Swiss-Prot record:
This is Large ribosomal subunit protein bL32c. Keywords: Chloroplast, Plastid, Ribonucleoprotein, Ribosomal protein. It comes from Euglena gracilis. NCBIfam families: rpmF_bact. Belongs to the bacterial ribosomal protein bL32 family. It is found in: Plastid, Chloroplast. The lineage of its organism: Eukaryota, Discoba, Euglenozoa, Euglenida, Spirocuta. GO terms for cellular component: chloroplast; large ribosomal subunit. The keyword Transmembrane does not apply.
Length: 54
């Protein structure tokens, strides 16, 4: 079974988790935008904001 050899520092862990959350949030916003466009029958054109909510 694979296990890490050394303990990962809190700052490194938090940094990686933050990057992962940003990527997930971007995908979620894209999926919601696409879903809204399909619901409104404007599935040819859709967009989502570049700004991430804080």
């Amino acid at each position: 079974m694979a296990v890490p050899k050394k303990k990962m520092s809190k700052s490194r862990r938090n940094s990686r988790k933050s990057n992962w959350k940003k990527k997930v949030l971007k995908k979620v916003l894209f999926a919601l935008s696409l879903g809204k466009s399909f619901e409104a029958n404007t599935n040819v054109n859709f967009s989502f904001g570049d700004k991430l909510p804080q």
